[in-house]
Regions:
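Conserved AMP-binding/adenylate-forming core of the ANL superfamily
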Residues: 36-94, 111-116, 204-205
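Conserved ATP-binding/catalytic segment of the ANL
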Residues: 403-412, 416-471, 488
Length: 621
């Protein structure tokens, strides 16, 4: 760790990215060194396991690349993938990158409007989907120019195989040799606070440097012959995508769990040593364990054991560690409850990498107290995932780690986190003005997040300058997109979309007292006050329809699940809106916290801090 004259902190990288270092080379190098190592495992729908060695996977990548060339995919073409986390996704990604094409991920949950924007903005020429239904959705929103759409369940892989006829590995190598590390490898679209999402252009160098930086500080976790990582997060997410390539380029085995419904059976079969999760998954595991314990003696036993785990973890961070008494109580808790939860997560699990959203302190201490090493970090799509990450032995709960090697982090005078280095994007795709807004000097990327750095270089996130919501599941949500749609409803005077650190998106409405009389008369209802109207089934039904319409413009994960009508008015006089009638979001959230809590059945957590650890969160767009 080194502190620079400008106040930034950095760690010197041990790997220097070369002019022609590209993402597929990471696997190719491993295939040469360890051709017989198992690289990938995936369970089939009938429970059998498919395994491929590094040399077998490399041949599959080259063969698929031949087929893509045969289909007419050119260097620089943008090709989209709309599919679950799977071996097929990986294979297509590596093959596309091997011939100089650009991979454009599309979330399975993206709305038709979002897909249409991505296809148009990135000038996508071909789309591969998992299902016919997805292919039909893409066809329905495809722009006027021709976009080829192929689905795996309609024989896309066989089509690629047929197209490979007459194309040789030499053709692939010629394409590969022409690729520069500075070429764009992918365009990732992140949710923004206004308008359509911007495309984050990331280069091969971004991925290679970030992967090597992660390996430098977390080698024992992600680059060991004992490493087994089960990937179930969407690989459209930058962190999952990065980790996928990191594991493949190391010595470990990568597994896939395409459906969250089969996650626990997949964990039991794969026996991971490390899991990459978002906090919502950890919450579900905890809640499921608590629910299974139920009430009575078992419920009290679980609550007591969970408390001992948290207490033990907190004490372990102290200079002298936990006392003998705490160790004894922890041992009892482990025998009664904790080891049973660990067994659900697999006998080999040693590490959990949590990213994408903040993780509550009490939940972090619970898992740490179970004997699992919890690793958190901070980053955005614009930084190829992690720009800061905790090191083993230097991972206090609440912090998000040290700068990833090859990157610099400093705090601006207003508290904003500024970053630069090998992991930072060159810019937004074809948007120089918007790029200049976040990189005004062409070097330092302004994250929009607030934080602090201690004397050891440990970064702590304290808040956000921008209003982007990050749900407990790690999904970025633009509240304005929904609010602008809902504000057109005649009954709605004000709306605020909420959901930060919550399991789903919600909204608070205030009724328009001026418009209400006409609306009631139009619908044949007696005149009443806004307070009384809030109780009318017809009013609620009308608002439900408005919410359904607004939700059509966003993905399922961004959709409003619940709303409340509150008895309030937001005016300039009472400080809830500005003179230009913009909502003072933080004031509303603070003053109406009880109404927000009511949407979710209570506060986030009595012990949950305001600190945030974010891997791969998209910046304001």
């Amino acid at each position: 760790m080194k502190r620079m004259r400008d106040g930034s902190y950095t760690i010197k990288p041990t790997y220097k990215v070369g002019e022609h270092d590209i993402v597929p080379d990471m696997l190719a190098k491993r295939a040469l060194l360890h051709p017989d190592q198992v690289a990938v495992e995936q369970r089939s729908s009938v429970g059998s396991t498919r395994s491929l060695t590094t040399s077998e996977l490399q041949r599959q990548v080259e063969y698929t690349a031949c087929g893509l060339i045969g289909l007419g995919v050119q260097a620089g073409d943008a090709v989209a993938i709309l599919a679950p986390t799977s071996y097929e996704w990986l294979l297509l990604d590596l093959a596309l990158l091997s011939i100089g094409a650009i991979t454009v991920p599309i979330y399975e949950s993206d709305s038709a409007a979002q897909i249409e924007h991505i296809l148009t903005d990135a000038h996508v020429t071909r789309v591969f989907t998992a299902t016919t239904q997805q292919a039909e959705l893409v066809h329905s929103v495809a722009p006027d120019y021709t976009v080829s759409v192929d689905s795996f369940d309609r024989g896309a892989q066989r089509m690629i195989a047929r197209a490979a006829t007459g194309i040789t590995i030499e053709n692939v190598e010629q394409r590969r040799a022409a690729i520069s590390s500075s070429d764009i490898a992918t365009i990732i679209y992140t949710s923004g606070t206004t308008g359509n999402p911007k495309g984050v252009a990331l280069t091969h160098a971004n991925f290679v440097a970030t992967a090597e930086g992660a390996r430098q500080v977390l080698g024992e976790v992600i680059d060991s012959p004992e490493t087994r990582l089960l990937l179930f997060l969407p690989v459209a997410h930058v962190l999952a995508r990065l980790v996928m390539h990191v594991i493949l380029s190391g010595q470990g085995v990568l597994g896939f769990s395409p459906s969250i419904k089969n996650l626990l059976p997949d964990i039991q079969a794969f026996k991971p040593s490390v899991l990459l999760v978002v906090p919502r998954v950890l919450e579900k595991v905890y809640n499921a364990a608590s629910s299974k314990a139920g009430g009575g003696i078992k419920g009290r036993m679980f609550a007591w054991s969970a408390k001992q785990a948290r207490t033990f973890s907190v004490a372990s961070e102290k200079t002298f560690g936990p006392s003998l008494f705490k160790k004894m109580r922890h041992g009892i808790a482990d025998a009664l409850v904790l080891k049973k939860i660990r067994s659900v997560l697999g006998p080999n699990l040693r590490y959990i990498v949590s990213g994408g959203a903040p993780l509550a302190t009490d939940l972090a201490h619970f898992y740490a107290g179970m004997g699992i090493t919890l690793i958190q970090g901070y980053g955005l799509s614009e930084t190829t995932g992690p720009i800061a990450v905790q090191h083993i032995g230097k991972n206090p709960v609440g912090g998000v780690g040290l700068p990833l090697p090859g990157n610099f982090i400093k705090i601006a005078k207003d508290g904003e986190i500024l970053v630069r280095g090998q992991s930072v994007m060159p810019g937004y795709y074809h948007l120089p003005e918007q790029t200049a807004e976040v990189m005004p000097d062409g070097k330092w990327f302004h994250t929009g997040d607030l934080g602090s750095i201690d004397r050891k270089g440990q970064l702590t996130i304290t808040g956000r300058k921008k209003e982007l919501i990050v749900t407990a599941g790690g999904k970025n949500v633009s509240p304005e997109v929904l609010e602008d749609s809902l504000a057109t409803h005649p009954l709605i005077a004000n709306v605020i979309v909420v959901g930060d650190q919550r399991p789903y998106v919600g909204a608070l409405f205030t009724l328009d007292a001026d418009m209400l009389p006409d609306w009631l008369a139009k619908h044949g209802l007696p005149q009443c006050s806004p307070t009384e109207a809030a109780e009318l089934p017809a009013v609620r039904e009308s608002l439900e329809k408005a919410v359904e319409r607004a939700n059509k413009a966003v993905s399922r994960a961004e959709s409003i699940r619940k709303f409340r009508i509150i008895d309030a008015t937001f005016t300039v006089a009472n400080g809830y809106v500005t003179p230009s009638m913009k909502l003072r979001r933080r004031k509303v959230i603070t003053d109406y916290a009880h109404e927000i809590d009511a949407l979710y059945g209570g506060p986030i957590s009595a012990e949950a801090p305001k600190k945030r650890g974010l891997f791969g969160r998209g910046k304001k767009n």
